[in-house]
Swiss-Prot record:
The gene is tusB. Belongs to the DsrH/TusB family. It is found in: Cytoplasm. The lineage of its organism: Bacteria, Pseudomonadati, Pseudomonadota, Gammaproteobacteria, Enterobacterales. This is Protein TusB. Keywords: Cytoplasm, tRNA processing. One of its GO terms (biological process) is tRNA wobble position uridine thiolation. It holds the Pfam family DsrH. Heterohexamer, formed by a dimer of trimers. The hexameric TusBCD complex contains 2 copies each of TusB, TusC and TusD. The TusBCD complex interacts with TusE.
Length: 95
């Protein structure tokens, strides 16, 4: 399953999101969801320890001016790669 976080992690039940992640899943943050990747935030350790690959939409990271402040555990991708992830996963959960 592809889990997409579109809202700020401070407006979402991130603990629930993380508890739902399985090894075969992928996690993508976009829009204000990219804030989950900020270094030293309260959710970072938990999301990094999850068994999934972590992706961020590059354009959203740059639009918020946070590129130098995000964890290296996240992979920056563009919207073309986002489409590839949606094709890879038959199911998607948007948070």
């Amino acid at each position: 399953m592809l889990h997409t976080l579109m809202k700020s992690p401070f407006e979402t039940n991130v603990s629930l999101v993380i508890s739902m992640l399985k090894k075969s899943d992928d996690f993508l943050a976009l829009q204000d969801g990219v804030l989950i990747a900020l270094k030293d935030n309260i959710f970072l350790k938990s999301i990094i320890m999850s068994p999934v690959k972590l992706y961020l939409i590059k354009e959203d990271v740059y639009a918020r001016g946070i590129r130098k402040n995000i964890s290296r555990e996240f992979i920056l991708i563009n919207y073309i790669h986002f489409v590839s992830l949606t094709l890879k996963h038959k199911k998607q959960m948007t948070w």
